[in-house]
């Protein structure tokens, strides 16, 4: 046992500085005597690497952190390594607690870290030739092989360390350092920006690069909790973590080319990752730069997406949200190009459609978009024709989109103020070429709510044929009160 003396002294020292540590004799026992096991030699032969893994050095490594391993941890380690011949333990080289000088507070270790530190130090001394990466791999494999009982002491120690850490650093907040070159975008993930989700601001930047004529602020991007019923007033800035990626950051990483380039060609953004709720009206109005056919590849094969969940692929092709009161703001994002260009010239302050209906916006839970901001010229055109919204839809291939929202249910469009039992939008025949026919956009000053102009009992008859050619005919003007 004289070989073990230095080792004993070490454990005793550590026990003294360890808060509430049990008496040194206990630690000596646990450190010095391997648990008697009949299969000692077997274990050594079958698991030579494992046997060497944890025990003596845990303490040393621990030493560099200010916490020492309590007896239970050492016992657990020696339990895992039982059968190991302790006379082989060399006198470990003491490392001065270097971290004491550093102000940087480390995170409390989790259970695996507790185990790995305890084991690694010992093994590193034991097998100096072992490469650290190999060591880590082996430790990880070993940890996965441990059963709950063997892991428990490490888990408990980790919990103790966490509580202790909380006491020592009550205002500690984990702040990972931002590394410059991490494998594609891991640093962003650490910083809380979802990598799977392209920032709407980045999309907007890409779209804006070529179209100077859409002028309005970035803060139009809307996030879920924002509709708080104000009927006029500036739009609130985005609050969700999703949008706080700096707008200039090339967030379109997955396309593999910088933003400046992607602005030049019609930008190829991966529409599967875009949440339509966060596209601002500028983005939607600039969307004419896209080739409509580019959307086709993202259309679901049978045209039956869930109304709210699969909007992302269309990035602004439809402004329909699946919450009951979303429709007032939802409008035809697909306008003919002439109308969009007309709309994009600098205009007097535009009223965004979705902020006007203050009563119903109380109940909006999901993300909404401020859809096409119709310019005053549009409003005045449509004040005379009291029929819903005749836009020139013929310039888009609507056959791609006409079948994509068949699942809208009657309950979603009931508006308490204007109907008792009539549903605002009932897909009586399950066709939805009537999608746009129900929204009449009047001047906000004269119409506080969006009511159907034709009597709502007429609405069920609106859905016409599925074939897109009929969009050109002014079929909507025939809707008058019976």
Swiss-Prot record:
Keyword Cell inner membrane: no
SUPFAM superfamilies tied to this protein: HMG-box (SSF47095)
Chain intervals for the UniProt region annotation (PQA): 63-103
Motif (9aaTAD 3): 433-441
Cellular localisation: Nucleus; Cytoplasm
Gene3D superfamilies linked: High mobility group box domain (1.10.30.10)
Tissue: Expressed in both male and female gonads from after metamorphosis through to adult stages. In the testis, expression is restricted to the supporting Sertoli-like cells. Conversely in the ovary, expression is localized to primary oocytes (at protein level). In developing limbs, expressed before chrondrocytes form (stage 52 tadpoles) and throughout the cartilaginous anlagen until stage 56, after which expression ceases in the enlarged cells of the diaphysis.
Cross-link for Glycyl lysine isopeptide (Lys-Gly) (interchain with G-Cter in SUMO), residue positions: 61, 370
Amino acid composition bias (Polar residues), ranges on this chain: 42-52, 211-220, 308-326, 351-366, 458-482
BP terms from Gene Ontology: cartilage development; chondrocyte differentiation; gonadal mesoderm development; growth plate cartilage chondrocyte growth; inner ear development; negative regulation of canonical Wnt signaling pathway; negative regulation of fatty acid oxidation; negative regulation of osteoblast differentiation
Region spans: Dimerization (DIM): 63-103
Chain ranges for the short sequence motif 9aaTAD 2 as given in the UniProt record: 291-299
Chain location of the short sequence motif 9aaTAD 1 per the record: 276-285
Region described as Transactivation domain (TAC): 366-482
DNA-binding region: 105-173
PTM remark: Sumoylated. Lys-370 is the major site of sumoylation, although sumoylation at Lys-61 also occurs. Sumoylation plays a key role in regulating formation of the neural crest and otic placode.
Keywords: Activator, Chondrogenesis, Cytoplasm, Developmental protein, Differentiation, DNA-binding, Gonadal differentiation, Isopeptide bond, Nucleus, Transcription, Transcription regulation, Ubl conjugation
Transactivation domain (TAM): annotated segments: 224-308
Record note on quaternary structure: Interacts with the sumoylation factors ube2i/ubc9 and sumo1.
Domain free text: The 9aaTAD motif is a transactivation domain present in a large number of yeast and animal transcription factors.
The protein's name: Transcription factor Sox-9
């Amino acid at each position: 046992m004289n070989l073990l003396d230095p080792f004993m002294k070490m454990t005793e020292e550590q026990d003294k500085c360890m808060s509430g540590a049990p008496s040194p004799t206990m630690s000596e026992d646990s450190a010095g005597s391997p648990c008697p096991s009949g299969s000692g030699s077997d274990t050594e032969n079958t698991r030579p690497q494992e046997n060497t893994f944890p025990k003596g050095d845990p303490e040393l490594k621990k030493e560099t952190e200010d916490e020492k391993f309590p007896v239970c941890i050492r016992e657990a380690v020696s339990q895992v390594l039982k059968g190991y011949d302790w006379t082989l333990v060399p006198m470990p080289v003491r490392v001065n607690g270097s971290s004491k000088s550093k102000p940087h507070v480390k995170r409390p270790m989790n259970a695996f870290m507790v185990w790995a530190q305890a084991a690694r130090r010992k093994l590193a001394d034991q097998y100096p030739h072992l490469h650290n990466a190999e060591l880590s791999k082996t430790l990880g494999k070993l940890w996965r092989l441990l059963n709950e009982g063997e892991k428990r002491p490490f888990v408990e120690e980790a919990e103790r360390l966490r509580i202790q850490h909380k006491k020592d650093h009550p205002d500690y907040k984990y702040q990972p350092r931002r590394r410059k070159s991490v494998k594609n975008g891991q640093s962003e993930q650490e910083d809380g920006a979802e990598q799977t989700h392209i920032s709407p601001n980045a999309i907007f930047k890409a779209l804006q690069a070529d179209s100077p004529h859409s002028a309005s602020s970035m803060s139009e991007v809307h996030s879920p909790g924002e509709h708080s019923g104000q009927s006029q007033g500036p739009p609130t800035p985005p609050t969700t973590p999703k949008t706080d990626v700096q707008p200039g950051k090339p967030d379109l990483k997955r396309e593999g080319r910088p933003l400046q380039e992607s602005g030049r060609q019609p930008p190829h953004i991966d529409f599967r990752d875009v949440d339509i709720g966060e596209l601002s009206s500028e983005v939607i109005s600039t969307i004419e730069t896209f080739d409509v056919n580019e959307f086709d590849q993202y259309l679901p094969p049978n045209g039956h997406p869930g109304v709210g969940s699969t909007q992302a692929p269309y990035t602004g092709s439809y402004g329909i949200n699946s919450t009951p009161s979303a429709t007032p703001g939802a409008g035809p994002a697909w306008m003919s190009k002439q109308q969009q260009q007309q709309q994009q010239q600098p205009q007097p302050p535009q009223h965004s459609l979705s902020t006007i209906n203050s009563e119903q916006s109380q109940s909006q839970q999901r993300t909404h978009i401020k859809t096409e901001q119709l310019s005053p010229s549009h409003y005045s055109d449509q004040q005379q024709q009291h029929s819903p919204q005749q836009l020139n839809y013929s310039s888009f291939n609507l056959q791609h989109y006409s079948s994509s929202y068949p699942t809208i249910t009657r309950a979603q469009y009931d508006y308490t103020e204007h109907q008792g039992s009539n549903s605002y939008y009932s897909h009586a025949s399950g066709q939805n070429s009537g999608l746009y026919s129900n929204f009449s956009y009047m001047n906000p000053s004269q119409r506080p709510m969006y009511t159907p102009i034709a009597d709502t009992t007429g609405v069920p008859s609106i859905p016409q044929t599925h074939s897109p050619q009929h969009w050109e005919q002014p079929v909507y003007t025939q809707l008058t009160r019976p």
